[in-house]
Amino acid sequence: MDSNNQIEPCLSRKSSEGKPQIFTTLRNIDLNLLTIFEAVYVHKGIVNAAKVLNLTPSAISQSIQKLRVIFPDPLFIRKGQGVTPTAFAMHLHEYISQGLESILGALDIEGSYDKQRTITIATTPSVGALVLPVIYRAIKTHYPQLLLRNPPISDAENQLSQFQTDLIIDNMFCTNRTVQHHVLFTDNMVLICREGNPLLSLEDDRETIDNAAHVLLLPEEQNFSGLRQRVQEMFPDRQINFTSYNILTIAALVANSDMLAIIPSRFYNLFSRCWPLEKLPFPSLNEEQIDFSIHYNKFSLRDPILHGVIDVIRNAF
């Protein structure tokens, strides 16, 4: 009891500052009364509203009386066998109906309510450019009411385990047991250079390629240690002149220099539309592969909508 008495003055003091006033006001209103108000408004009568809500007409009338105490208006005027709303009630209806619709949308577990819900799919900028056009088309075909948001990846495992994002699409490897994944596609690695690079005219000149200046992509995940080791064995003497975690930067740099870089094939296909890039044949490197997967919290599968979205994305690839 003492703690409640201490809280009351705090709420009173803060209510004058803005937002806390909302909670003070809502605490004094039974939100069920707003549902009854909407039922009477929509069905234009107390008896009809009582049937819809499975209540007695007397209970509906008592609720309207409570609303008349809260609001300085009679709200509904008897007209024939029903009631007609006052101008003030019409004004209230605009806001109450929108509020109830928003609540229904937020509580829409089964996806039966035709309002927008936001699904977050985190990616890096480069992976997003590669996969999100395909994902957007697929999701909009099956779930046109969904709104998609694409936040950045900061701490992938934490984002998923703490439900800060719904899905992550990347080539990362998670050790958290709550995070599950499905491989969407597997990509081959390619060696790229700019159009007109002198190396394009040389046939299988391993030594020249090995001695050329290289740009190195630095993936953070530990699961690439094996790939890095094998690439190092293929190019033991390569000269690393530039390193970056950003594959877009690497593509732009290669397109404007004589340096070489190793990137996944699908990124080459995408970037070659933006920059003058070419592939250098290197069969042993082209056999190297990298997986791109969709990652999610395993408890998200309890959500029918999110479960369906995951299936749609998997089928899109």
Swiss-Prot record:
Any GO BP: regulation of DNA-templated transcription
Residue ranges of domain HTH lysR-type in the record: 29-86
DNA-binding annotation, residue ranges on this chain: 46-65
GO MF, any single term: DNA binding
Alphabetized Pfam families for the sequence: HTH_1, LysR_substrate
Stored InterPro entries: LysR-type_TF, LysR_subst-bd, Tscrpt_reg_HTH_LysR, WH-like_DNA-bd_sf, WH_DNA-bd_sf
Record's keyword terms, sorted: DNA-binding, Transcription, Transcription regulation
Family of the protein in this entry: Belongs to the LysR transcriptional regulatory family.
Name used for this protein in its record: Uncharacterized HTH-type transcriptional regulator YbeF
Species whose genome carries this gene: Escherichia coli (strain K12)
